[in-house]
Amino acid sequence: EQHLSLRRQRQMSIRDRINYSFDNKKIINSFHCHCEDCQRSTGAGKASILVIIKSNFNLNGEPKFYGTKGSMGSTVNRGFCSNCGSGIFSYLKELPNFLFLKVGSLEDSSWVKIESNYFTKSCNEWNMPDEQLKSFKGNPNLLENIKTLIKSLN
């Protein structure tokens, strides 16, 4: 089911140092991640994420990166604007062809439809998950879900 608009998205950082575009018809997944790592990296109760194929992402500018171990032990590389500090996307060493785009970095996010909540076991009372979305206590085997979706696109 297609639930996203057919326009291309464009983002610009606060200081116009970095911009990107992608075709939002090709989004693989969308979720709120409540894991402790996302809570720390965003300074909030969750990160809202769009999963896209790296080849569907056009980047202008040079983000800075820092690497860390994620909640499941994967190597997470987080890209951010070196001028304003805004988080833009992450990628996992174990899934180099996919980007985890921060919804908050979009110029216009009004079209985004989040599908589910991940790591609800890490939620705080002040930031409970949307009960109308599918919820998972941890990561619902994201790697296998992505592989299945890729096969369906081919």
Language model regions located:
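A short Gly-Trp-Pro
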Residues: 8, 18-154
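Single conserved hydrophobic/aromatic residue that forms the stacking wall/gate
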Residues: 1-14
